[in-house]
């Protein structure tokens, strides 16, 4: 076995070496537990091993799979951006690229004046929730007591 490292750097994120590999990978934004388990299986690694025992070659293999998971055999339904709006490819975005893509999607909806974009603009719920009692913003007004 390789030397144990308490912090392992994968895809620009520090992972806890004491956790199981599949749980450690969930620290990367855009990678959930199911996707992390798939990445481990495709890379030929035990998802239950401690992340601190990863070698540099194994880290590189994981990073390659995270860059293009569909090409490495992960199914299309598992990626977080199927049929990308601009390219039409099945992508799986992680970390800053994921944040940027979400921000660009919201800006596109606002620019074309779609209903969802207008709701985002106004700071209202976007997915059909009711607004009578929830989603109130700002400071609450307390109840004043009567003077005796």
UniProtKB/Swiss-Prot annotation:
<keyword id="KW-0694">RNA-binding</keyword>
<comment type="subunit">
    <text>Part of the 30S ribosomal subunit. Forms a loose heterodimer with protein S19. Forms two bridges to the 50S subunit in the 70S ribosome.</text>
</comment>
<dbReference type="InterPro" id="IPR019977">
    <property type="entry name" value="Ribosomal_uS13_archaeal"/>
</dbReference>
<protein>
    <recommendedName>
        <fullName>Small ribosomal subunit protein uS13</fullName>
    </recommendedName>
</protein>
<dbReference type="GO" id="GO:0006412">
    <property type="term" value="P:translation"/>
</dbReference>
<dbReference type="GO" id="GO:0003735">
    <property type="term" value="F:structural constituent of ribosome"/>
</dbReference>
<dbReference type="InterPro" id="IPR010979">
    <property type="entry name" value="Ribosomal_uS13-like_H2TH"/>
</dbReference>
<dbReference type="InterPro" id="IPR018269">
    <property type="entry name" value="Ribosomal_uS13_CS"/>
</dbReference>
<dbReference type="Pfam" id="PF00416">
    <property type="entry name" value="Ribosomal_S13"/>
</dbReference>
<keyword id="KW-0699">rRNA-binding</keyword>
<dbReference type="InterPro" id="IPR001892">
    <property type="entry name" value="Ribosomal_uS13"/>
</dbReference>
<comment type="function">
    <text>Located at the top of the head of the 30S subunit, it contacts several helices of the 16S rRNA. In the 70S ribosome it contacts the 23S rRNA (bridge B1a) and protein L5 of the 50S subunit (bridge B1b), connecting the 2 subunits; these bridges are implicated in subunit movement.</text>
</comment>
<dbReference type="GO" id="GO:0005829">
    <property type="term" value="C:cytosol"/>
</dbReference>
<comment type="similarity">
    <text>Belongs to the universal ribosomal protein uS13 family.</text>
</comment>
<dbReference type="GO" id="GO:0015935">
    <property type="term" value="C:small ribosomal subunit"/>
</dbReference>
<dbReference type="InterPro" id="IPR027437">
    <property type="entry name" value="Rbsml_uS13_C"/>
</dbReference>
<keyword id="KW-0687">Ribonucleoprotein</keyword>
<keyword id="KW-0689">Ribosomal protein</keyword>
<dbReference type="GO" id="GO:0019843">
    <property type="term" value="F:rRNA binding"/>
</dbReference>
